[in-house]
């Protein structure tokens, strides 16, 4: 049952709610570990919902890829931190009662001479099997993560890690061409020749990528911690009032102005204002040089930040196609109504009641009205004097994908 069949209940073109589908209920908590070049993270999704609910989400900055360009090996200190983090994550997963953990490692472990030794050590000490994925697979999973949040997305996905940067084309819900490069800021920090040497490497690498992919005039989707740090600083520079990272939009001009803003300010002061860790802030000046190069070579018309990446792409792998095709906004609002409203199901009746007031609206506008109807009663517990404010906070700051 995928929710598309006819029943006595008319669900409209958004179909039966996913939480009413037995197959969806069978997808219990999903645990994913991402062993990156800069950080190690555990995410536990509370079921493979169309709009993911994060039951647990923790990151440890390990810098496994620090010095990789010079030594060819993983950072010894990074290995110690990563092993400690993985032991802890495995203990947490056991305490939560996860049936299984999916663990992937990316560029640093993939390219290091001692990468396979590290994978073996993790298996011996924790029982966790790490799957080392290649650059093409890394790009595919990141692109799938973007599709989890934007089912109809089109454009170029750019995922930056510590030791690599991946590009993937997306269109009509499908992942197209995929490319990988060595443009991770942790790796670039070790390039000889200082800033000029880095600029030369960045320019030459991007020229090669553009030759393979061609100009990308659609949207550029940014995935990765360094991109999110740049977006946080851009928010701070613009005094942007809504500090929600997912779907935050920027223009090429914004990036240029934020680059100058970073150069003109003390980095320690800036990172505190923007809420960026010191380890991440050290990489931001390099990452923004890469981003400016991407804009020059590919010329996208606008930029959107995606909080969804590899980990969400792995969640996407668990989903049947019928679930992938659903609208994440409507599904998350339906779930919120079922969990928090006094009369679950009334939102759909309310939507039908007011529909004649909007005879000529677009599909995009209709889905927003539908979502508002579903959320109309989820804040009933708030004090009546502040209920309007609480409703606003819920709608603007809740974890509503799409």
Predicted regions and their residues:
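Non-catalytic pre-domain segments flanking phosphatase-related domains
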Residues: 1-29
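N-terminal basic/disordered segments at the start of proteins
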Residues: 26-53
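Helical "lid/coupling" subdomains associated with nucleotide-phosphate turnover
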Residues: 30, 44-47, 63, 67-96, ...
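A short acidic Gly-Thr/Ser loop motif
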Residues: 33-39, 158-164, 223-226, 307
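A secondary-structure boundary/capping signal
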Residues: 36, 105-106
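N-terminal glycine-rich anion-binding loops that anchor highly charged ligand groups
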Residues: 51-62
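Conserved beta-strand/loop subsegment of P-loop NTPase cores
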Residues: 99-103
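Acidic donor-binding segment of Leloir-type glycosyltransferases
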Residues: 121
């Amino acid at each position: 049952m995928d929710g598309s069949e006819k029943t006595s209940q008319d669900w409209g073109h958004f179909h039966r709610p996913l939480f009413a589908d037995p197959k969806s209920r069978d997808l219990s908590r999903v645990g994913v570990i991402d062993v990156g070049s800069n950080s190690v993270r555990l995410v536990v999704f509370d079921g493979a919902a169309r709009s993911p609910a994060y039951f647990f989400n923790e990151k440890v900055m390990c810098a496994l890829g620090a010095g990789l360009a010079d030594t060819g090996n993983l950072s010894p200190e990074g290995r110690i931190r990563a092993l400690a983090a993985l032991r802890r994550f495995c203990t947490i997963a056991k305490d939560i009662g996860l049936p299984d953990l999916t663990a992937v490692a990316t560029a640093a472990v993939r390219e290091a001479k001692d990468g396979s030794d590290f994978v073996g050590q993790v298996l011996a000490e924790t029982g966790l099997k790490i799957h080392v994925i290649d650059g093409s697979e890394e790009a595919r999973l990141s692109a799938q993560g973007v599709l989890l949040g934007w089912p109809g997305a089109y454009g170029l996905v750019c995922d930056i890690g510590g030791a690599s940067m991946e590009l993937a084309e997306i269109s009509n819900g499908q992942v197209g061409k995929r490319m990988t490069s060595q443009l991770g800021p942790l790796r670039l920090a070790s390039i000889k020749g200082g800033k000029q040497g880095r600029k030369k490497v960045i320019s030459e690498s991007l020229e090669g990528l553009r030759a393979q992919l061609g100009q990308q005039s659609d949207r550029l989707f940014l995935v990765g911690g360094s991109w999110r740090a740049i977006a946080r600083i851009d928010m701070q520079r613009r005094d942007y009032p809504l500090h929600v990272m997912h779907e935050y939009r920027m223009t090429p001009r914004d990036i240029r102005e934020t680059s100058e803003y970073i150069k003109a300010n003390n980095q320690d002061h800036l990172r505190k204002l923007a809420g960026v860790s010191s380890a991440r802030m050290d990489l931001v000046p390099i990452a923004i040089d890469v981003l400016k190069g991407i804009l020059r070579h590919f010329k996208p018309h606008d930029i959107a930040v995606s909080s969804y990446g590899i980990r969400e792409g792995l969640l996407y792998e668990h989903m049947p196609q019928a679930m992938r095709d659903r609208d994440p906004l409507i599904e998350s609002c339906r779930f919120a109504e079922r969990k928090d409203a006094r009369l679950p199901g009334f939102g759909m009746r309310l939507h039908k009641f007011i529909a004649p007031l909007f005879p000529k609206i677009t599909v995009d506008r209709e889905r927003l009205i539908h979502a508002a109807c579903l959320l109309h009663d989820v804040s009933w517990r708030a004090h009546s004097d502040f209920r309007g404010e609480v409703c606003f906070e819920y709608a603007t700051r809740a974890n509503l994908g799409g």
